[in-house]
């Protein structure tokens, strides 16, 4: 009995070591399972540079009141009569059908000609994009137009380096497989060839000449709407592009183009005429009944 009593602390110690080992081993396995998601549960990788607090709460403004603009100065904004052009029913039908026909020809074109494009045309399509509605009319967009050969090539280098990582590591097998039929990869030759690159930045908040910040409500939605109008303006001008969302390239491109910290890259559009040998996938659009619900 005395021997058993003397051995009891030893048994307890050994038992504690075994339990501790088993617990630690189970934690290690659980950690590995979390770090390596299966193909079934993997989700498309998200651009972390765009993950910011775009909606400023009242509490945030109260805590940092001195840093933010007082909007009471704009309360007496004058209002003016609005009288748009009105068309007859037949004119409305004709204009809407012709515009649809024009836009239905729009395609994502990755084969772009180096043929020069008049700068005035680019000015006009950017000006048109700037007519988009925005939260509280903050117009939270910046369109950086690049035509310099060296800068375009540096942009290509940055994007291709990150895109190769995206395709091989971040995007996941399902995303990569879904893109195979479109024959896309991380090589972006059009970034060198296109006469212009338009980089669209959203302004997470505004910065006034006084240094104070201005709240930009729904800035990403507002800038996305302006991108849609920009695509329509390019199509109307007879130009082509392909919508490019260079994941994880925002900080490097922002630095290259010397943009402030409040601007986040949302989209990049190479712009020009289609190459003479340009090809696009033979895709069909959804029928009206598949995209519209009438209540």
UniProtKB/Swiss-Prot annotation:
The keyword Flavoprotein is assigned to this record: yes
Pfam families: Nitroreductase (PF00881)
Membrane association type: Single-pass membrane protein
Example GO BP: tyrosine metabolic process
Binding site for 3-iodo-L-tyrosine: 136, 163, 167, 188
Residue segments, region Disordered: 29-81
Cellular component, GO annotation: plasma membrane
Name of the top EC class for this enzyme: oxidoreductase
The protein's Enzyme Commission number: 1.21.1.1
Gene3D superfamilies recorded: NADH Oxidase
Cofactor: FMN
Residues reported in the UniProt entry to bind FMN: 106-110, 134-135, 243-245, 285
Acidic residues composition bias: residue spans: 63-75
Alphabetical keyword list: Flavoprotein, FMN, Membrane, NADP, Oxidoreductase, Transmembrane, Transmembrane helix
Reaction(s) catalysed (UniProt annotation): 2 iodide + L-tyrosine + 2 NADP(+) = 3,5-diiodo-L-tyrosine + 2 NADPH + H(+); iodide + L-tyrosine + NADP(+) = 3-iodo-L-tyrosine + NADPH; 3-iodo-L-tyrosine + iodide + NADP(+) = 3,5-diiodo-L-tyrosine + NADPH + H(+); L-tyrosine + chloride + NADP(+) = 3-chloro-L-tyrosine + NADPH
Residue stretches spanning the membrane: 3-23
GO MF: FMN binding; iodotyrosine deiodinase activity; oxidoreductase activity
Superkingdom per UniProt: Eukaryota
Subcellular compartments: Membrane
Role, per record: Catalyzes the dehalogenation of halotyrosines such as 3,5-diiodo-L-tyrosine. Likely to also catalyze the dehalogenation of other halotyrosines such as 3-bromo-L-tyrosine, 3-chloro-L-tyrosine and 3-iodo-L-tyrosine.
Recorded family membership: Belongs to the nitroreductase family.
The protein, known as: Iodotyrosine deiodinase
């Amino acid at each position: 009995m005395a021997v058993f009593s003397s051995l009891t602390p030893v048994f307890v110690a050994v038992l504690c070591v075994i339990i501790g080992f088993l617990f630690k081993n189970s934690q290690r396995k659980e950690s590995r399972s979390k770090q390596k998601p299966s193909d079934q549960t993997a989700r498309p990788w998200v651009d972390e540079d765009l993950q910011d607090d775009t909606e400023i709460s009242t509490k945030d403004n109260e805590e940092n009141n001195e840093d933010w603009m007082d909007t009471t100065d704009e309360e007496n904004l004058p209002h003016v009569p609005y009288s748009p052009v009105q068309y007859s029913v037949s004119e409305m039908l004709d204009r809407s059908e012709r515009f649809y026909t024009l836009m239905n020809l729009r395609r994502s074109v990755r084969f772009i000609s180096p043929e020069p494009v008049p700068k005035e045309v680019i000015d006009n399509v950017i000006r048109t994009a700037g007519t988009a509605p925005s939260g509280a009319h903050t117009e939270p967009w910046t369109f950086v137009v690049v035509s310099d050969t060296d800068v375009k090539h540096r942009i290509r280098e940055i994007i291709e380096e990150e895109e190769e990582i995206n395709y091989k590591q971040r995007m996941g097998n399902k995303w990569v497989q879904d893109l195979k039929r479109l024959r896309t990869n991380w090589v972006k030759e059009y970034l060198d060839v296109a006469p212009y690159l338009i980089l669209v930045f959203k302004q997470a908040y505004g910065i006034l000449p006084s240094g104070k910040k201005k709240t930009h409500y729904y800035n990403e939605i507002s800038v996305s709407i302006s991108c849609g109008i920009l695509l329509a303006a390019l199509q109307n001008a007879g130009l082509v592009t392909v919508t490019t969302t260079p994941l994880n390239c925002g900080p490097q491109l922002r630095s290259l183009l010397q943009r402030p910290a409040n601007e986040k890259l949302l989209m990049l559009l190479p712009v020009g005429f289609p190459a003479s040998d340009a090809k696009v996938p033979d895709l069909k659009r959804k029928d009206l009944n598949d995209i519209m619900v009438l209540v």
